[in-house]
Amino acid sequence: MYPFLILGIKIRDGLWPFTIIIVAITVYANALWGVFQFDDYNVIVFNPSVHSLKAWWQDAGSGIRQLLKLTYTLNWLAGPNSFGFHVFNMVCHAVNSFLIYYLTKRLTYNAVIAFITALFFAVHPIQTESVTYISGRSSSLMAVFYLGSLLAYTRVERSSGWGGRWGLFSALLFLLAILTKEVSLTLPFALVLWELCVSEKPICFMDMLKRQAFHWLIFIASLSVFFLFTRYTRLILFSMNLRSLKSNLLSQLNGITSTVSHYLLLNRLNIDPDLPVISRWSLTVGIEFLFLCVIVAAGIFSLVRLIRKKSETSEVLPQNQKVIPQPEIYPVIFSFSVFWFIIQLIPTSTLIPRIDIINERHFYLAGWVIFLLFSSCIVYVFAKIINNMKCMWVTVIVLAMLAGGFTIARNHIYRNEIALWEDTVKKSPNKARGYNNLGYAYFLAGRYDDAIRAYKKALEINPNHTLARNNLEMAYKASKRR
């Protein structure tokens, strides 16, 4: 097989990355026949600005996620049904799984860890909210450019000054990521983290910033532009009035802990989780905060030790030996994982409150390091303790098949609105919105009595739910006309 180039990677008989792509497509194949759900109606179906290129261009001045909206527009023009949207999302996820493999391989110098990490990234059902749920494209498409930019940056030569062609290409992908979703502004910080963990030479911050100059210029320019658009300023002002800083941080901490548990408790996956707004300390929140502090402190200690070790090693190397020997991969993995996770969640889970405290799609990129830590533990245990790699592969295959089975089952729930919202109210029985949406799904299906019961339940939970009250009146009228 002749080698070909993808972001500067020569692939000769590269079965593993293509196996990952095939697996990703396989587990999401049944998602192609899913329908529009939840926010898809406001974002796509009932949004005229994504129904034609002219309308998209007229709306371009809003400055909000225009590249994402362009993909919606092109999908809509190809056919105003959900099939094409699902194909696009599935391709994005397959590409991301491919990129995760190569980034993990560059980070760990270990193809086995890279393969297992990318495999579980591809098949784990927590990703369905970013793949099967059409509006989750904001996360998966942004990740294509974000990870692509990072991978292109790894090709930058340390002696290239301003980054060379790969630096420019990386910066271009960064710009595309910003035009897809604003949280991608964290990329320059991720580049610094990558250098600190992966660089084979002692860190010279001035040289590093020079290589990243275009990224930081885009970062500063984008922040400036965002504040010029009234939509962004109105959104920020609205968000800041939702809850206090203390209440938001405590609620987010609890929400992060709850969502992380979904990586193991696969039956708890939920498109509309009922997470409480926490305004005061409790024993549970205190334990969660203490655990977070321990993890962050360990990450800082590990990263500082890693940087110091590189510096000390460089001092004793012969002058003609410019590259530091490859460090132990496990401290690198741990340090990178802790700070990557923090960097990815800072925009959505810290200072600016959101109506929904947290959603599973916010973990699409952050979850990479959860799979990385899991894969590293698997390899370490079976390679160095049990010393049985065949047993490891059997374990990996069984777990991947189990996760893939849950993903296929989760995709099936997205097949229609009734199935999705029946699943949601089982998992969030005290949240009025789920019952209102279930009632509307029943109403559209002509099941007016079921719709009335669902609306009544929503009003029982929240008597001030105006939309449910209006929908109930509409359901009563439709029921009488039968």
Predicted regions, residues:
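Polytopic membrane enzymes that build or remodel cell-surface glycoconjugates and lipids
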Residues: Y2-Y476, K480
